[in-house]
Amino acid sequence: LEEHGDVDKVLSECKYTVEQTYHTKANQQTMMETFRTACYMDHFGRLVVLSSTQIPFHVRRIVGRALDIPASKVRVIKPRIGGGFGAKQTSVSEIYPAIVTWKTGRPSKMIFSRHESMICSSPRHEMEITVRAGADENGIIKAIDVYTLSNTGAYGEHSSTTVGLSGHKSIGLYRHTEAYRFAFDVVYTNVQAAGAYRGYGATQGIFAVESAVNELAHKMGMDPVKVKEMNMPI
């Protein structure tokens, strides 16, 4: 829970208020290039991992620990990749060819089909976000209250950071607030584990808060763009 000021009191004093719940889906990753990794041993005796990844240093650490070898024995090369959007912020295809090459000394590669990539990648976190907002007679937004319920799926990778950004990146857009509150819960469910996805939680939160501000502007009979111009930092 993060709170500044007395949200309930300020909202009760606002001339215009809105309360609405918004739902965002667990969109699937569909980067053009699927997960793929090639491995070989170099002339220094190092395991070279050539991978379509967004996290080369994490891959180096993970492969080293999986094989129980020092990180100095692993070199990760990250070429220009054909899209990642957050899906490749998880180690997916690197471990198996790394094991094969380290055990046999021979080159190896692993290329995922589109179907395999969709099974193994991490979709966006599904969220249910409740927003309360209030403004005075001049259209100045005085209070924002955001509660996010995030579905992380079967495992909690990126769960605490993405849900945090749903509030931190949305409430902060408005500079005249006298009070704000942000609270969240994350739940495990028996579905595909969610992870990093473009916007990283901010997308869901901003969609909800901006939708609430649009509805608030409609109540006030004002242009939503005008309301946002009046309330956002210059």
Regions found by a protein language model. Give the residues of each.
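Structural alpha/beta core scaffold segments of enzyme domains
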Residues: 1-234
